[in-house]
Amino acid sequence: MSLEFGSVALQTQNEDEEFDKEDFEREKELQQLLTDLPHDMLDDELSSPERHDSDCSMDGRAAEPHPSEHLERKWIERDILPKPHSMNCGNGWEENRSKTEDQHLGYHPGEGGDEGGSGYSPPGKREQADLYRLPEDFRPYTGGSKQAASVITFSDPQRDNFQQFGLSRGPSCGALEPYKAVYKPYRNSSVQKNSSPAQEVAASDMFEGLQQQFLGANETDSAENIHIIQLQVLNKAKERQLDSLVEKLKDSERQVRYLSHQLLIVQDEKDGLALSLRESQQLFQNGKEREMQLEAQIAALEAQVEAFRVSEEKLTKKLRTTEITLESLKQQLVELHHSESLQRAREHHESIVASLTQKHEEQVSSLQKNLDATITALQEQESICTRLKDHVQQLERNQEAVRLEKTELINRLTRSLEDSQKQCAHLLQSGSVQEVAQLQLQLQQAQKAHVLSESMNKALQEELTELKDEISLYESAAELGVLPGDSEGDLSIELTESCVDLGIKKVNWKQSKANRVTQQESPDEDPSKDELILKLKTQVQRLLTSNSVKRHLVSQLQSDLRECRETMEAFQQSKDGDSGMETKTDTSEKTTKQLWLESSEAINREDILQLKNEVQVLQKQNQELKEAEEKLRSTNQDLCNQMRQMVQEFDHDKQEAVARCERTYQQHHEAMKAQIRESLLAKHAVEKQHLLEVYEGTQSQLRSDLDKMNKEMAAVQECYLEVCREKDGLESTLRKTMEKAQEQKRQLLEAREEYVRKLKLELEEKYQETLKTERQSWLQEQAAGATQQAEKESRQKLIQQLEKEWQSKLDDSLAAWRKTTSDRGSQTEQVACPAAVSKAEAAAVLAEEQARQVQQEKELATKEALRKPEVELELKYCEIIAQKVETAVQNARSRWIQELPMLAEYKALLRAQQQEWAKQQELAVAHRLSLALSEAKEKWKSELENMKPNVMSVKELEEKVHSLQKELELKDEEVPVIVRAEVAKARTEWNKEKQEEIHKIQEQNEEDYRQFLEDHRNKINEVLAAAKEDFVKQKAELLLQKETEFQACLDQSRKEWTLQEAQQTQVEIRQYEEDTLTVLAYLLKDTQLEYGGDSQDKQLLEAMSACSSKWISVQYFEKVKACIQKALHDMLSLLTDSVASEQEKRKVVKSSADTVSWTSSEGDSAVPVPLPDSTSVRCAQSSAWLKAEAETDKKICEIKGLRCGHCFQELEKEKQECQDLRRKLEKCRRHLQHLERTHRAAVEKLGEENSRVVEELIEENHDMKNKLEALRALCRTPPRSLSAGAAESAGPSCSRQALEELRGQYIKAVRKIKRDMLRYIQESKERAAEMVKAEVLRERQETARKMRNYYLSCLQQILQDNGKEEGAEKKIMSAASKLATMAELLGTIAESDCRVRCAQAGRSVALPLASEMLTGTERSERSGVNHNIPHYVESKPNSGKTLPRSVCEQLPGRKAAPRSQRRLEESKHREMRPMASTALPSDCRCGDASCRHSGVLAKDVAPEFVPCQGEGGFDLHEKRDALGAGSEPLLYSAAHSFLGGAEKNSSPRCISESRHTTLRSPSEMPRLKALMCGSPTETDSIASEKSQGVGSQDSPVKDGVGPSSSPAWPSDSTLPCGSPAVLFLGDGSQRTQEMLGDSVQWKQFSATSCHPDAQKSNMVCRSSHTLDLPKETLHSQQGKMGATLGHPSPQSTDMLKTDFKRLSGTGPSSLCQKPLIKLTAPMPSQQDSGFDSPLE
């Protein structure tokens, strides 16, 4: 049997199906995903799209009754028979299969492929769709005991090529044809999708019946059945082979993945090796650099060695010459010793010396005698001094005793004074003192008492009369019945606190009445004071009680009143209830109407009348009670006032009495004080005179003593002079010793130099030896490094070779694997091939593993080889660091040792020790002298005492006396000599030590001075070097920053240029589009005319003239015309065909249904109306063309809007970045300036300190030199014995030294005072400046506060208008006058500064402004842009936008102003921030009215200012240069009136707050010019530092609110203002995108507000300049924001016209009804106004 069984079916299938490339690419991507998946995912059994029943087949026994046979038959019918189209669609098949595909029996989409010689078949659609999911009708199947479930795997393109197999071609292929005709599949997809188990059983029964019919019909054809069974067996065999191949493929895939994984590992290792290689190369390069450095060092050392050798040779030559000279000198010395002339000179010298010594001895003896005499005189004077001292001490003691006595006296007197004062105070406090005081007062005031008593009597009588009147009133009130009945009887009311305080006791009212009767009876009698007081007290008590009673009554009345009120309220409530009941009864009566009407009305009326009467009665009672209460209140108030007056008078009397008592006491006290003072002063004067006499005596005595002491001091000075002479002699001896010491030092220095030379030679020898050893070691290291490098290179070569071999092996294995797979696909008979391939693959794998092992070993070896030098290098580095640390420690220690003597503490300790040593030496010398003298005296005394008892004869005594005298004389001579010798020794030793110390101190000072100078110089040099380095670094950084900024500016200019180019291209594209549209319109008209019958040639010329572009020609016209005609012809042919077909259809319909009338179906949309003529066709074509053109225009506009929006977003971002960069630049500049200032200040400070220190050191050096010269002069002076006038010259030398010292000290003191004074003056100046600043600030704050208060008061007056009802004009005039006064007051503060600065700025800006205006006008005239067009410009916060090219050409370039001008302008900005802002005049009308606008901006505002609208109104801004170097881009703002409404309000009526900033007078023009007409960099810097949203704050005043002139007018609208400058419209990307959606609103606005045809809607706006916005502004706003205003777009304007015509009927006159209120803002320097200035 042939194996090519089902190739025909496969070929037909391949021919019918078209191979899709996209599906093939998807399969490739899936294959890559599957190869990347792990093994666990691939081994899943349910992951393949194969059918489980692909392995199921018959067992080979047809007649055996087994249950699996039935199922196998069902499987044959199900799988061999073709599946319906609906089922395939349900399973995810998307392609309609042809009838030929359904008729092939052998086509199984999910099973294996063909293994015949037909080759690879393309993959099916089901495999692509069902790669990762099973079909919905899938059920696993097991074909009996012998057959197991097949393993489901994912499909890949290599395997899918095998999985499409069917019946091969053969001789029995024709016998299978009847199966195609008989067995058609069941096509109901819903049955198979949602089939229940019963339905499945029914279907299986049906298939069994069909199978039995088929078998019964073909029992004769048993050979064919056998053939089918054989084919099934073959299919099973093929399936098994396929399974084995699939398993092998899986193995191969796993191997491939494993190999790919290993490949990745190897690649990572390769990368690691490459990194290590790079590191090793870097190390090698570092080593080379170190070698080069070492070589350079070695060369330098060799050069030094050669220099040393040359110096050695020179030194050896010098030594030889010096040795020769020494030998010659020795010979000369020997010859001189032998010469006679020298001997004679020696003898002569010795004789002179002997004579000089004799003379010196004689002089010394004479001097010693003189000294003895002076010593004796000194001793006498010392004894006299001791006596005088004792006398002085006695006198001091006497004086102290006198002082003590005086102090005791003073203390006693003070004590007695204090006692007397205490006694006086006690007496005054006691009663006797009071009696004395009363007597004195009676004596002194005897005459005044009578007058006072009379006056008091008169006052009391007046008061009594008043009280009588009051009592009569009170009695009349009691009679009337206000008081209770028992008031005449005994009232047992307790006294109040006020009565107790006044001292009033209880008194019966009867007694008071009796008293009153007695008073009435005897009015002529004069009562005494006590009686009067008692009467008054009783009256007061009675009044107080009556007052309390009255109060009680008032409280009772108040309670009664409250009760009455409560009753009244209750009555009112009842009345209200009655009224409510009346209303209720009325309602009930209305409902019932008839029942109980008459009776209820009568009853209610009676009740109401009764209640009314009661209410009237109660009201009368209430009024009476209120009147009574008011009367009682008035009476009570009068009584209270009277009581208050009484109490006040009593208090006043009390105070007067106390004041009198105090006066008398003070007078007495002062009199006593005066007496005591007089007595004490007299005593003090006497004692003072006595003490003065005593002190004068003591002073005379002391003066005499002082004269004596002065004489003694003169003698002592003479002695001191002699001592100084001796000192000079000792100094001469010291000089000699010093010279000897210097010679010894020189010898020592020579020996030291010789030692140093020897040491140098030894060190040089050692250095040469170490050099040799180091050279040898370096050569060895170099050789080792070369060997290591060679090894590394060989290793690298080996690694590369191994990589190449491994790669080649991999490629070979992959190629062999591919070949094996291809052989398997084509040849099914060769089964042994996979085994061979697997062996080859195993061998390749083994080879790879071996190569890997070798590579790993090599890598380990290389790593170990690399580690060793790294470890050595680390050890060397650690040693170097340790050495550096040790050297640093040693250096620090040496510096510390050197700096020790420099310290102030060390010097202070040295001085203190020196002073202590000097004191100790002086004390020791004095102690020795005193000991020697005391010993001598004691010996003499002991000898005398010993001699006294031995009474001898007179001769012997005389002889003894003489002998003793001689001995005494000798001893006296010897003792001073010994003393002198000891003193001289001590002095010599002290002088020596002192001189040594002086020399040491001088040397130390010189060394310290040198070190200090060197350190100071080093420090200064270091500081200067650091400063230079910092300056260089800062300079480099600044250069880099400037370069980056320059690059940024270049990039920005490039971007702007690209934007301009894009805009130009867009403009050209628009022109082309417009030209094409015009051409098409004219051509369409021409074609219509041609079809109409008359065509004109003049239209071509008109079209040529209308088109602006040059590229349109006659040929182009002809081509376009031909194309249009062709298209029309085609359309006509198509339309005629369609019309003919429709007519035929209609005829058929008419013939079939005659009853249906065509008239009823005229409105039907499905039936097309026949076109009778060609004119209807043309109309339809023209309408279609118009629609198409409108759609294309809309699309183009949308696309351009999107592009522009994106570009504007990018532009905004770039401009923000530019602004940030400029801010950073300015900050950097400020920082640099600050650094430069600080640097200069630091350098100046250092220089000043250095100069001060140098001056101080120079002064100290001069002082030290002067001292040294004085000492040398002292040392150089010859001894006293040689010159006779030495004694005379010693005095002036000492005086000169003293004078010089005094002069130096005086100069130092003067300098110190000068410095202190300068410092004090500087500090005082600083304090004064601070005080002045504080005062100025305080004054400013006070003035600002005053102005604020005045401003608030003015505002209040303006708002209140003082309650006067005046007219509107008067109010406005008064407000204007108040504001003018405020402005004058406020303007006085900064008027002078502003005038000066404005004048300077005006001079600097006038000429460039004129040139810029001229150039701007010329360019604008050339470019043909209309200057009279008013524009609306909105300043948005934080958004700057570039201008188009045309605008940039119009605006002239400007140069950056200097820094001083910028500062001036910044200060002006701060001083003149708020500007006057006024709203529209009140005669602004809309609708039929007119909008009269004073052209303030046109007249007053310079062309450098542009009206820019913020959220609150218009502001003035400066035109800015777009292409100037270093200038910021112009604030590119859009018309807020167009786009603001789309963001905030979408309602047709939007209330606007309009403001319009104007300049009040032409006098303010220079200020604005000075402020605004600077360079763009200045304005940009100012704008960036201040708020960027210029004029974006809303004004707080909302009175001037009125509806705007358009239905879509925004909330913050503006009014047009003309200016001769050229302005442009633009907006941000966000608003453009929002406005593209809300185009209707701004179309309405543009049609009503800015369109030239706005007169149709009864809208008239009159101003000094024309307010006609062109059509292009609207088009530029609708998505072409960057374009200029010179290119109109007819489509947008036509659309707007149509929209306006639709919406103009809404009536704009109804929208503009209220006029806008005129608002006047305060003047500039006031900041609390609430108005926003345009310059903020």
From Swiss-Prot:
In residue numbers, the region (Disordered) covers 1-127, 571-592, 1416-1479, 1543-1562, 1574-1614, 1677-1736
Any one GO CC term of this protein is: centriole
Q: Which UniProt keywords apply?
A: Acetylation, Cilium biogenesis/degradation, Coiled coil, Cytoplasm, Cytoskeleton, Phosphoprotein
Residues with the N6-acetyllysine modification: K1714
What InterPro entries does the record tag this protein with? CEP152/SHC-Transforming
Any one Gene Ontology biological process term? de novo centriole assembly involved in multi-ciliated epithelial cell differentiation
The UniProt regions of compositional bias labelled Basic and acidic residues, in chain numbering, are 61-82, 94-105, 575-592, 1462-1473
How is the subunit organization of this protein annotated in UniProt? Interacts (via N-terminus) with PLK4; the interaction is mutally exclusive with a PLK4:CEP192 interaction. Interacts (via C-terminus) with CPAP (via-N-terminus). Interacts with CINP. Interacts with CDK5RAP2, WDR62, CEP63 and CEP131. CEP63, CDK5RAP2, CEP152, WDR62 are proposed to form a stepwise assembled complex at the centrosome forming a ring near parental centrioles. Interacts with DEUP1; this interaction recruits CEP152 to the deuterosome. The interactions with CEP63 and DEUP1 are mutually exclusive. Interacts with CCDC66.
PANTHER family per record: CENTROSOMAL PROTEIN OF 152 KDA, SHC TRANSFORMING PROTEIN
Task: Please give the function described in this protein's UniProt entry.
Answer: Necessary for centrosome duplication; the function also seems to involve CEP63, CDK5RAP2 and WDR62 through a stepwise assembled complex at the centrosome that recruits CDK2 required for centriole duplication. Acts as a molecular scaffold facilitating the interaction of PLK4 and CPAP, 2 molecules involved in centriole formation. Proposed to snatch PLK4 away from PLK4:CEP92 complexes in early G1 daughter centriole and to reposition PLK4 at the outer boundary of a newly forming CEP152 ring structure.
Q: In its UniProt entry, what is this protein called? A: Centrosomal protein of 152 kDa
Name its species: Mus musculus
- Name of the gene encoding the protein in the UniProt record: Cep152
